[in-house]
Amino acid sequence: KGSKRVMLKNVQDAKFRMVLQPIARVALPAADQKRVSFDAFFTHILMHELMHGLGPHNINVGGSATTVRQQLKETYSTIEEAKADVSGLWALAQLANQKAIDPAIARTMYTTFLASAFRSIRFGINEAHGRGIAIQMNYMLDKGAFRVNPDHTFSVDDAKMTDAITSLTREIMTLQAEGSYE
């Protein structure tokens, strides 16, 4: 049993050039726009897909066998998309710190993620990816990892971002493991 994912790099490159970069020019200060990279964008997409497999699918709640999907009901897809995003960032940070991947990605992945968050949320919060990214953006703003600048652009505080992705990953993984709908 397993899964197979097909990623079309040329399609993602077109999304990056035609959608993400124009969004970054509006949403980020000029200096931060230099920290938006295709490698960080594409690598995070790959990690996002891998992270869908992270965590339990079958759990035990109150002595009964069930699934995370059954327990989380209509919130499951939103929480799953948020988990894949934030745990993907967490995993990339771990791999970069251990030099399993080029550590240079650490300089661009958070700012690229911020720009990409605006790309994802434009689909609205009536869709799982949009709701998931809205949760993450609000969490990052609350933790000071994302900040709104006086010119109404957005920036990343890398140090706070590292702590925020770790804590949000932990919260989501715990929520799923416990099947905590409330």
What residue spans do the PLM features occupy?
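Active-site-adjacent "gating/activation" loops or surface patches in catalytic cores
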Residues: K1-R69
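Residue-identity detector for glutamine
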Residues: Q12, Q21, Q33, Q70-Q71, ...
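Long, well-structured alpha-helical subdomains associated
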Residues: L89-Y181
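Proteins with a high burden of low-complexity, intrinsically disordered sequence enriched in S/T/G/P/A and R
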Residues: K1-S3, I79, V86, A128
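An active-site-proximal "capping" alpha-helix that borders the catalytic cofactor pocket
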Residues: S77-Q94
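Generic structural "secondary-structure junction" signal
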Residues: L8-N10, R25, E74, T78, ...
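Alpha-helix capping and helix-loop boundary segments enriched in small/acidic/polar residues
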Residues: A30-F41, T67-A82, I101-I105, M109
